[in-house]
Design a protein with these regions (language model features):
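Cytosolic-side transmembrane helix boundary signature
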Residues: 1-10
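A structural signal for short, hydrophobic/glycine-enriched beta-strand patches
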Residues: 12-191, 195
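Structured C-terminal subdomain patch of bacterial secreted/periplasmic proteins
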Residues: 190-213
């Protein structure tokens, strides 16, 4: 009975801790600290924009990279590829053959493996494989908090590519962020949801870094 009460108290304390915005600020900053918000036209030039799909904001940013001539092709991927995102990209003026849809990937690892395979199949006008002519420069488009894990997976599953982070959807380092203030210490359900997402990113990063060698 005493152990049961202790477990309840421990669970309550952990839940309360993860409900604090200040905890999310620290966790999120640890993931986003190496990246900055950047206008699409200021992103270094690459060959391919790899949109690790999942939201219209990422789809929009990836399309803007192509329109700004930062990339020649756009590969958008995700679980079944959100048709709304694909339609948005087309509506923004990026269409096939510049746009390539990956409808098979179920996670980030498969996103990258499939994109590598697709790039390896492309040929120059003279028939020479594009991948044989130079190392690919890949603009990796995903949320800022997901970028550390995405870059790790790029090094692991597409090692010959020069991966260039093109982060979007910042959650902590937003230009309009209030930073730490009094309500950073007030628990909320929104903070709990964000903090669990941050925690999941750390777990995913560690799993690929140390367990999946």
């Amino acid at each position: 009975m005493q152990w049961g009460r202790r477990l309840v108290w421990i669970g309550t304390a952990i839940t309360l801790l993860f409900s604090l915005p200040i905890v999310g600020y620290l966790l999120g900053y640890g993931l986003e600290c190496n990246y900055e918000e950047c206008d699409p036209k200021d992103v270094p030039k690459g060959d391919v924009a790899l949109d690790l799909g999942g939201s219209w904001r990422r789809a929009w940013y990836a399309a803007e990279l192509v329109k700004a001539r930062r990339a020649r092709w756009l590969i958008t991927s995700g679980v079944g590829v959100d048709l709304v995102d694909a339609k948005l990209i087309r509506d923004l003026g990026v269409k096939e053959p510049t746009l390539i849809l990956d409808v098979e990937a179920r996670n980030t690892e498969e996103n990258i493996k499939n994109a590598r395979r697709v790039f390896g199949e492309w040929c120059l006008p003279d028939g020479q494989p594009l991948a044989a002519s130079r190392l690919p420069r890949v603009l990796v488009v995903t949320t800022a908090v997901h970028m550390p894990r995405s870059m790790l997976l790029m090094r692991k599953y597409w090692p010959e590519a020069q991966a260039i982070p093109a982060p979007t959807e910042f959650m902590v380092k937003r230009k309009d962020s209030k930073g730490i203030c009094w309500d950073s210490f007030v628990p909320s359900l929104c903070a709990l949801e964000c903090n669990l997402a941050f925690y999941n990113e750390y777990l995913g990063y560690m799993a690929y870094r140390w367990l999946k060698r």
